Amino acid sequence: MLEDTSFAIQPEQDDKTQETHRIDIGNMHTFSHTEHVFSFHCDTGIVKIRFYREDIVRIAFNPFGETSLSTSVAVVKEPEKVDASVHETEEEVTLTSAKQTVVLQKRPFRVRIYDNHGRLLVAEGKKGMAFTYQGEVCCFKMMDEADHFYGFGEKTGFLDKRGETMTMWNTDVYAPHNPETDPLYQSHPYFMTVRNGSAHGIFFDNTYKTTFDFQTATDEYCFSAEGGAIDYYVFAGPTPKDVLEQYTDLTGRMPLPPKWALGYHQSRYSYETEQEVREIAQTFIEKDIPLDVIYLDIHYMNGYRVFTFDRNRFPNLKQLIADLKQKGIRVVPIVDPGVKEDPEYVIYQEGIRHDYFCKYIEGNVYFGEVWPGKSAFPDFTNKKVRKWWGEKHQFYTDLGIEGIWNDMNEPSVFNETKTMDVKVIHDNDGDPKTHRELHNVYGFMMGEATYKGMKKLLNGKRPFLLTRAGFSGIQRYAAVWTGDNRSFWEHLQMSLPMCMNLGLSGVAFCGPDVGGFAHNTNGELLTRWMQVGAFTPYFRNHCAIGFRRQEPWAFGEKYERIIKKYIRLRYQWLPHLYTLFAEAHETGAPVMRPLFFEYPDDENTYNLYDEFLVGANVLIAPIMTPSTTRRVAYFPKGNWVDYWTGEVLEGGQYHLISADLETLPIFIKQGSAIALGDVKRSTEMPDEHRTVHIYKANGGKATYVLYDDDGQTFSYEKGDYLRMYIEVEYGENSVHIVTKSEGTYQPSWKLSFAIHHATEQTKVTIDGNEQNAIFDPHQRILLIQSE
């Protein structure tokens, strides 16, 4: 019997052993440099340092062999040719670029890094780089009292990770996770430090099991790995936006997804028959509830064999997919890595024949138990296997499918360790490595194979890929959902910091299973969660077999009406959200942001985890406890306008706000703008109108960027997009708008403006021309239709 709280589920506790003796790197004796690489010869090995940009520096040390400057699959950036000066004294060597200074203490060897304003970023004190004879490597850094730590990818708990210890080892948590569960499905050995209003970051490029220890009572923190080298990058910032731009320049940014992927997704483990899928789709249509995607979980397959479908359950799958697509609904099937051992199964036959499966060093194939039973696992570290796997997705594209859901790709195995034997050997494109070293990138490389295969097969259309497992850089290929949560209020609460920290780790396209995967939800919880989901980047309702259904109508008309309202609101907000996705594609900035991201000088924002920003100027303060209609919310500097009532709240302070079950508290910063579109049943329906809502201030200037393209192809990469810069100058009784556009895309919609907090006498000009406006005295809005 499941309890009513997930506190009953406790993470596994490892036996605590005495700390292994660590050997310090020792003293530096000599140094040299060639072609932008600086080498420092120390007692126990060579440290190599290279500037990747003026504001990114890489430091590598391998105590067990040659220090290599090769990279993991996470890194896509080639180092720039950065001019750096060198200065040596008796005690130190100093390397200086235009934006960073690296000071190397000689005895013992210790690293300090400053920005170009002399701000200390990271420093080593009593301890520095060290290792053990068992193969562990570790790096200690000084921890300031003012330090706050964010990122680390997919982690439960609070937003600020100071005081926590986290492990990176992709793990399928059989019992749905709770706020103390660690590790989870993804590994992102990266974090951002915010200190006194400024930010910097560190990426530890090591694919072994890694640990980040901020739980220490001392003034040092540590990051370590079970094997490999110390190899990390320091990002100089100085703002959180700068750090994320630097990190995603190194590890890559997400491609723009198809617009349909931003719509509402409905899923269940499982919709088990063609008839059930048709009934679900038809109910959405009859109830006029927008929908873009229905998922097929594992029951669509023939005996859980990937690249098959059960012809008894789905006798006309191709026709089903075509019929739904005509109605604006796409089908996304699940694809796991496990390939059933079956001599008559063509995928298994091909894998055996071409030596595509993971093997032991002796040459025998590794088998593990997963949903199909005894199964082999493709070795995605081999480019031939990735190509083969990608090509196999023609099975799906021939059916009309444009999106894939990768699951069980940690890889998950039904055994005591929950995964593949760490002694398995991966080909690694001719440089064999153990699974112990490459475990954390298995799901990443499956994602690469899937995305690239689908992209090629779709002939210019954008594919959509959803993944459970991943590593730093996974944003290049996939959206991420946070795995098997539960239908508890605490899991709704937990989803906010999880998604915000994923966004701070470069994964802008993410979201939880709305409503909770396991356990039985209720109408109030589902409603409050759907309100939040309408503003998370990825919006999917998903629940497990054996538990209460969670479709929008599952709890009766009272809740259905409210849920429908917020799904429709999601579609109305898609122009604004799509603009933010374009920003994420271009700069790495998250769609869903913690408040400190925009207000790093405001220490009141550092620990806020129960409210978030959508972009820079929209604040969401959801209700996330039962039978609650009021909450306290913090508002940063500026004035904030209640989206529903128009009430203006002064920022820089806390406010008690009211929100009945029908209301999600949404606030727009005065002086900013948002672009809204038509309410429609699917993203397949074109917008006829686009309205830029300007929230008038009494003075000052602001710029809003509106982005659009065809939403389906990659033509935006060749300039076929619209980026409209809308510059607004506010007077006490005037609003002057200047527009400037770039790109070749010609949208079908007509542009309008709505000036909030205006009067009938407010003068409005657009590009120098005075406008005739319609005034709504009740809402105090001036409406202007642009020609």
From Swiss-Prot:
**A matching Pfam family:** Glyco_hydro_31_2nd
GO BP of this protein: carbohydrate metabolic process
Q: Which PROSITE patterns match?
A: GLYCOSYL_HYDROL_F31_1 (PS00129), GLYCOSYL_HYDROL_F31_2 (PS00707)
> Does the keyword field hold Hydrolase?
yes
- Provide the top EC class: hydrolase
Keyword Hydrolase appears in the UniProt entry: yes
Ordered alphabetically, the record's keywords are:
Glycosidase, Hydrolase
User: Which residues are catalytic?
Assistant: 407, 410, 484 (proton donor)
Q: List the disulfide bonds.
A: none
Q: Which reaction does it catalyse?
A: Hydrolysis of terminal, non-reducing (1->4)-linked alpha-D-glucose residues with release of alpha-D-glucose
Documented EC number(s): 3.2.1.20
InterPro entries per the record? DUF5110, Gal_mutarotase_sf_dom, Glyco_hydro_31_AS, Glyco_hydro_31_C, Glyco_hydro_31_CS, Glyco_hydro_31_N_dom, Glyco_hydro_31_TIM, Glyco_hydro_b
The GO terms this record gives for MF are:
alpha-1,4-glucosidase activity; carbohydrate binding
Q: Quote the subunit structure annotation.
A: Homohexamer.
Q: Which family does it belong to?
A: Belongs to the glycosyl hydrolase 31 family.
Q: What is this protein called?
A: Alpha-glucosidase 2
